Amino acid sequence: MKYNDLRDFLTLLEQQGELKRITLPVDPHLEITEIADRTLRAGGPALLFENPKGYSMPVLCNLFGTPKRVAMGMGQEDVSALREVGKLLAFLKEPEPPKGFRDLFDKLPQFKQVLNMPTKRLRGAPCQQKIVSGDDVDLNRIPIMTCWPEDAAPLITWGLTVTRGPHKERQNLGIYRQQLIGKNKLIMRWLSHRGGALDYQEWCAAHPGERFPVSVALGADPATILGAVTPVPDTLSEYAFAGLLRGTKTEVVKCISNDLEVPASAEIVLEGYIEQGETAPEGPYGDHTGYYNEVDSFPVFTVTHITQREDAIYHSTYTGRPPDEPAVLGVALNEVFVPILQKQFPEIVDFYLPPEGCSYRLAVVTIKKQYAGHAKRVMMGVWSFLRQFMYTKFVIVCDDDVNARDWNDVIWAITTRMDPARDTVLVENTPIDYLDFASPVSGLGSKMGLDATNKWPGETQREWGRPIKKDPDVVAHIDAIWDELAIFNNGKSA
């Protein structure tokens, strides 16, 4: 699944019936959200609104609205192939030298992919075909969506924010929502543990009073966007990972007003700075939990330059109660997580983040249990191994005879293999999602682990129940005569 940029990818989608062009005028204020939401819930195509009311720039929505399109964005044909992406990430996270010639031969595809890791810097780029600066900067010319009736203001949702800390060689790419508050002002909502916020904190400590350079790319190629939301090892840049996914080096260009590098093929780039100490109240906004979040203060991003392609496309989305686009992304990226976890915990058979659990707040893990207390070790491992699971409130651990993706199986295991007092683990005062208003303190809450495995000696003193199993000979015999029985046919059985 080869493509060079977002437009290339849209052409591929259109050829496969995965893109619908909407020529009817539609308002970015609430109407696009309503159409995109109905389309996503029906498993429909990506949507390109060619005539948003009041604007000359088209709006792209629902790009990653199905797991298949997420897989395509990662250079794969289908979701099942994303396990291979996870295996590659697991290898890069903890690379092992070849153990011999045969092992070297087996690892050659991985080593070959690594050759696509370095970025390629261009002198000129499509994203700088048109440039406005100073008083000519006007974010109101971009069809920024207002998604829900009580949202505070139009909101940029798919902005790829590029930052660099004062002591770091490589840049950080993150996706943070940005509230429009003026023709050249946005509120940068990044949580304190996120890469961009950490870069900013380090900058303030190293350069008191100096402006912090920031650039935001809109409409980057899908591999680069997905690289920013994937559990990339800390030693690997998101641009490098995008090159691995795409099979070609990521092309970047230096910004006009700062030294940051942005995707050369991005549709729009916002360049500017954060003035230390300048903050503004952000929100409320409807978010992925299905609720409006609290108002809180975040840094203000001042835009000094807007560069863009000719006939630029504005890429956007909405977030709300699942299913939404982030939930679909979570379903697809779930397949990437499994091999990474299995690399650290080989006993893990499957790992599932149900989308109805806001994509990350609840996890179901199945394991090949090997000793008493094993389930609790896995719980602690899930919470601590990848930062993506820092906010996972509930971890349910089951044996490998349970299908982690079937609630009927999981609920059966919980209700038959758990004693609430013995098999529930509660951990207090842990990092929790700022948007989780159920926690007693903003950003700090508790976690619960549920051990729904069969109990081993040492975990119980009682004789453990034996699951009912059918007689295989009887099953085979009934299979052979099933059609003759005609139970579900109108005709009579023989």
From Swiss-Prot:
Its cofactor is prenylated FMN; Mn(2+). Pfam families: UbiD, UbiD_C, UbiD_N. Pathway: Cofactor biosynthesis; ubiquinone biosynthesis. Its EC number is 4.1.1.98. InterPro entries: UbiD (IPR002830), UbiD-like_C (IPR049381), UbiD-like_N (IPR049383), UbiD_bacteria (IPR023677), UbiD_Rift_dom (IPR048304). It is found in: Cell membrane. Catalyzes the decarboxylation of 3-octaprenyl-4-hydroxy benzoate to 2-octaprenylphenol, an intermediate step in ubiquinone biosynthesis. This is 3-octaprenyl-4-hydroxybenzoate carboxy-lyase.
